[in-house]
Amino acid sequence: QRVLDALNRIGGCGLENLKITGATEQDGYRNKVQYPVQEQNGRAEAGFFSAGTHRVIPIAHCRIQPDCADAIRAAVLRWMAQYKIRAYDEKTGRGYIRHIYIRRGAVSGETLVCISANCKQLPRSAELTAAIRAAAPDVTSIVFTPNEKKGNTILGDTFLPLYGPGWIQDTLCGLTFRLSPAAFYQVNHDQAEILYRKALQFAALTGTETVLDLYCGTGTITLCLAREAGRAVGVEVVPQAIEDAKENAKRNGLAD
């Protein structure tokens, strides 16, 4: 209903109803999860913010997250407890660990873990890497992002690999994509494929057009369009996403 209201109010479409294409997977479909970390009663907890607040509600499991997420989250919290590494306190600006970020390739099965922390060098990083790999052997990249900004910003501006290349790859609509921590990628892989194919159908490209893809992220839509248009141009403000997009164009033989 919100989408319908927005289309009518903002787009002036005059629609009475929308046909919904339902998702085939209701559980475990989300390929990315971000847990804020917070000190509660003398121990670090990770979960999700309570609605309208910055108070973390600890969780044991979330049905829509990747299967590996629980083990990774628990491993990080155990590491924090073992080495007395404090969670970041948004009010005082003290403490270290801010967020646990996990991204998993739906097709590739590759998994990236990114730790956001309020420091330039992550203490006990070797022990953290060992703990995560022991808990989730399919993790292929572990990254530390220094984030000393005030507030609750999730990621910093730089990404330092602790293990692996610092990115994962996945396949979408027959194309292979490199995915870095800061780059946008649709969180529901299967529905993204349905969405992209429907967009291509509506575009009805003949092979002569120049297509502009604004806020292109890693270039997923841009490259899907490039196969059917005369020329496709992606525009993005996130530097890491652009680097991924250029690499993805090369990987798929679609670079100019």
Cite the ranges covered by each PLM segment:
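Rossmann-like S-adenosyl-L-methionine
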Residues: 124-256
